[in-house]
């Protein structure tokens, strides 16, 4: 029997971080959600914890107002403590799991992982919600112990409602860590687990980005509009009503471009590499 996750940390209070936080709380997990101190505060503003915690508190507030609802019940938000990475990082001690959902930037992630390694209890599982950055690149400079307890846990938006959870192990990830997070994902979070390899954009985004990019290219070749495409690629094809372009909007065009660029740069030998070039529009 694997140990359940009772306490977790979430780093990053944006759309994904706040969604992960809310669903952890839905599953009965006590959550610490931290974000950076907002830049540009005056010296007087820096003295007020409410100002310093503004990003994390805003993420919690956004989750409480989210539609569709992120929490099963708003009272579950009582399981969440918010703070910032400068003043409150010690709150992560005692966590079974800490997951980051910050910007997809190697340098920023590496800096965070260094800080976590210097703070967390030995054996704490650390996960990244990256949509496709390579584990080996993110963990440059980290210890053997840290790498052993590290994996990718890639949730999809909106976290409460999307069944898929991708788990990806690094070369040195302990199989017991993968087992524990599989049980956590299936039994506590109610997710369907897909185990991917540490390849560009894993499984879901690799397929989804290819499909979306190919659809956009075909639209341009056929002289269609986004409205035309969505009328075809939604319910008439057995797909959700969000179809193609509404799905792209929901995912975020900036996220879609990041995933496309990552695939294009990494898949140098793929015969269909050019599909991942985002259209000029």
Region locations from a protein language model:
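N-terminal glycine-rich phosphate-binding loop for ADP-containing cofactors
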Residues: 1-281
């Amino acid at each position: 029997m694997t140990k359940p996750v009772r306490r977790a940390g979430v780093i990053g209070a944006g759309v994904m971080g706040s969604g992960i936080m809310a669903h952890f709380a839905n599953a009965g997990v006590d959550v610490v959600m931290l974000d950076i101190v907002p830049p540009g505060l005056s010296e007087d503003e820096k003295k007020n914890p409410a100002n310093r915690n503004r990003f994390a508190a805003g993420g919690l507030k956004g989750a409480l107002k989210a539609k569709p609802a992120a929490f099963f019940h708003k009272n579950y938000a009582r399981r969440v403590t918010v703070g910032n990475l400068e003043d409150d990082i010690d709150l992560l001690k005692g966590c079974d799991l800490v997951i980051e959902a910050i910007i997809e930037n190697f340098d920023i992630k590496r800096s965070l992982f260094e800080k976590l390694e210097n703070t967390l209890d030995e054996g704490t599982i650390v996960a990244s919600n990256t949509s496709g950055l390579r584990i080996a690149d993110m963990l440059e400079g980290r210890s053997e112990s840290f790498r052993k307890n590290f994996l990718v846990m890639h949730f999809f938006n909106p976290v409460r409602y999307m069944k898929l959870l991708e788990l990806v192990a690094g070369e040195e990830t302990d199989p017991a860590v993968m087992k524990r997070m599989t049980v956590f994902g299936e039994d506590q979070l109610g997710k369907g687990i897909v185990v991917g390899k540490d390849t560009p954009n894993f499984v879901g985004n690799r397929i989804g980005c290819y499909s979306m990019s190919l659809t956009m290219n075909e639209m341009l070749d056929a002289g269609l509009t986004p409205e035309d495409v969505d009328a075809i690629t939604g319910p008439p094809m057995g797909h959700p009503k969000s179809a193609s372009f509404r799905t792209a909007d929901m995912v975020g065009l900036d996220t879609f471009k990041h995933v496309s660029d990552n695939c294009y740069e990494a898949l140098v030998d793929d015969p269909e590499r050019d599909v991942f070039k985002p259209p000029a529009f």
